[in-house]
Amino acid sequence: MGSDGDKKKKFIVAGSVSGFLVIMVVSVAVVTSKHSPKDDENHIRKTTKAVQAVCAPTDFKDTCVNSLMGASPDSDDPVDLIKLGFKVTIKSINESLEKASGDIKAKADKNPEAKGAFELCEKLMIDAIDDLKKCMDHGFSVDQIEVFVEDLRVWLSGSIAFQQTCMDSFGEIKSNLMQDMLKIFKTSRELSSNSLAMVTRISTLIPNSNLTGLTGALAKYARKLLSTEDSIPTWVGPEARRLMAAQGGGPGPVKANAVVAQDGTGQFKTITDALNAVPKGNKVPFIIHIKEGIYKEKVTVTKKMPHVTFIGDGPNKTLITGSLNFGIGKVKTFLTATITIEGDHFTAKNIGIENTAGPEGGQAVALRVSADYAVFHSCQIDGHQDTLYVHSHRQFYRDCTVSGTVDFIFGDAKCILQNCKIVVRKPNKGQTCMVTAQGRSNVRESTGLVLHGCHITGDPAYIPMKSVNKAYLGRPWKEFSRTIIMKTTIDDVIDPAGWLPWSGDFALKTLYYAEHMNTGPGSNQAQRVKWPGIKKLTPQDALLYTGDRFLRGDTWIPQTQVPYTAKV
């Protein structure tokens, strides 16, 4: 039971947020109880003003106002109007898909590469719609305004990432179809941007609305809902609870829902067969023990497989390997991953993942993660170009090793790598190495890549050639690329300039790159590039990119029994 002071604070919080929502429709008149033509006029006037208010922060105001008014809103409540925005965006994507299925598909079918790009694009647009549906279905509560807004921003950022990836898939082929696709999906992409702008507007007012006590209260509330005193979720069964607790300290005897073993000592010989045993509509951890061995298979944890956990016998004992690539095999980058994770609430511990295509294979992903609330602990992820594709949503990596050459940690997730070893490998002759290539394409996306307490070093085979094949902390894949490196040891494998342009002056003014409290010979910033987008963080700024603030990690990471540092 809270004190009177707590009740007063909660009242202030609710009043602050409610006040903001009222301000958005400040011109709305009181509705009369009797229906008349005048009532209709008043309703239209009120609704128009409310729509103009919620559309005010958007970049495409005409598109926003026309789409909402065209949907004949029956409410002037701003939350209802924002959710109506999600609905019209879904409708627009579906209509654009239908149009593309006629206009573009006929052209794409004549070219195998274009056909593959279109088929991938169809899937990605459906994924984009799914994220928008999550937003529509999310219950709103003033008492949980921060959680509400955070979830919406993550899912809207995910929807935008899926749509951008669709366009990128056409960029990998020699064709003018990308321009055709951009034209067809222009309105739906504008609507997606507008939805994010409306939601972000709420979030920008939260810190100024006397909500300082809310974050802690919400974290405490979420923990109460999800977990017992031992920080394991209440919905975890007793056997799964014992297993998760046991695995927190490393590999050991495992009793799981499914066991994979190549020698026949488990129920399954392949990981894919074990995944097929995940119950439909699964809502509790389904733990798959993958015994020691080399598994040559392409593994996909689909969106219909939430709450899956992989536990191996060690990153050097349980190895999942593949070699799909774009450079030689002409497989779309998005589809080259040895392991693909799309099911939410995924956890992996003590496994190795690799793509063996080599530097000549070009883009060759070892691990691609598009799931929300994904956690990897004590895993080794090896490749060359595009090793780790942190595609979208919330992701956390702890005590992992990631190796590669070009853009080998890339994507548009809201992601932290903590206490990880980042290894630059020997590239092809003439190649330059970039550790990161973050892909935020909209300035309001909540996404970004944080390396916290990591160690950036070089493979022994790379060290002799570091002065010729230089390595950099990263480059901006998209216009609003955001990467923060803090409390990380940086060896002298990184060039003193630190960062590399993508092409010309692209994104140099709009990116957000920061280094904070790093150590090691490669951390000296005296000769760093002086781009407008390079930031110097204050200690207060750095708090925004910690586990508890950037990922709201206190509410979900401890439940996985993975080590986790919440603060700087």
Swiss-Prot record:
One of its GO terms (biological process) is pectin catabolic process. Substrate binds at residues 333, 363, 475, 477. The PMEI region may act as an autoinhibitory domain and prevent untimely PME activity during transport. Residues 1-33 form the signal peptide. SUPFAM superfamilies: Pectin lyase-like, Plant invertase/pectin methylesterase inhibitor. GO terms for molecular function: enzyme inhibitor activity; pectinesterase activity. It is an enzyme of class 3 (hydrolase). It is found in: Secreted, Cell wall. Residues 45-198 are annotated as: Pectinesterase inhibitor 23. In the N-terminal section; belongs to the PMEI family. Expressed in mature pollen grains in the anthers and on the stigma. Found in pollen tubes within the style. Pfam families: Pectinesterase, PMEI. The active site is at 386 (proton donor), 407 (nucleophile). It catalyses: [(1->4)-alpha-D-galacturonosyl methyl ester](n) + n H2O = [(1->4)-alpha-D-galacturonosyl](n) + n methanol + n H(+). This is Probable pectinesterase/pectinesterase inhibitor 23. Glycans are attached at residues 94, 210, 316. Keywords: Aspartyl esterase, Cell wall, Cell wall biogenesis/degradation, Disulfide bond, Glycoprotein, Hydrolase, Secreted, Signal. Residues 251-548 are annotated as: Pectinesterase 23. Disulfide bonds join 400-420. Its EC number is 3.1.1.11. The keyword NAD does not apply.
